[in-house]
Amino acid sequence: MLRNLKKTLVLDSSVFIQGIDIEGYTTPSVVEEIKDRESKIFLESLISAGKVKIAEPSKESIDRIIQVAKETGEVNELSKADIEVLALAYELKGEIFSDDYNVQNIASLLGLRFRTLKRGIKKVIKWRYVCIGCGRKFSTLPPGGVCPDCGSKVKLIPRKR
């Protein structure tokens, strides 16, 4: 259904928090993510004016984003809103407007363009989880973020090339 739309911007919450008057699409989770009163009013005014439309990405697009996020080690770093923004942009072949480095990283891997309010990423990074105690490496975050071998905290670090 959404595939026939022209190329457009898919907006993350940072756009509304910064008060950028812009046209594009966002997702239900981004709307839920906006908590402060001023940003909420601003977003509602853009929706009322028809400048911002709310759309939900397909399950297939969401599954693709989760797959790529698992490959990069960033799946636990993404919020539901981040995943939806990436999935909607993937589905629409649109451009993402976000300051989130994890979102930018995955967008780059998928060949999606992105815009930022601040400085964006310089290179794509793949991540892994490593125990700070014993150095054991994990592809996903262990339960509770704790190493099952030594009980130390597990941190996300960039993979070496």
From Swiss-Prot:
Q: Report the cofactors.
A: Mn(2+); Zn(2+)
Q: Coiled-coil segments, which residues?
A: none
Which EC number(s) are documented for this chain? 3.1.-.-
* Keyword Membrane tagged: no
* Residues at which Mn(2+) binds: 12
Which cellular components does GO assign to this protein?
A: preribosome, small subunit precursor
Q: Specify the PINc domain's residue ranges.
A: 7-105
Which species is this UniProt entry from? Answer: Pyrococcus horikoshii (strain ATCC 700860 / DSM 12428 / JCM 9974 / NBRC 100139 / OT-3)
This protein's encoding gene: nob1
Q: What is this protein called?
A: Endoribonuclease Nob1
Annotated spans, Flexible linker: 120-125
Q: What keywords would UniProt list here?
A: Endonuclease, Hydrolase, Manganese, Metal-binding, Nuclease, Ribosome biogenesis, RNA-binding, rRNA-binding, Toxin-antitoxin system, Zinc
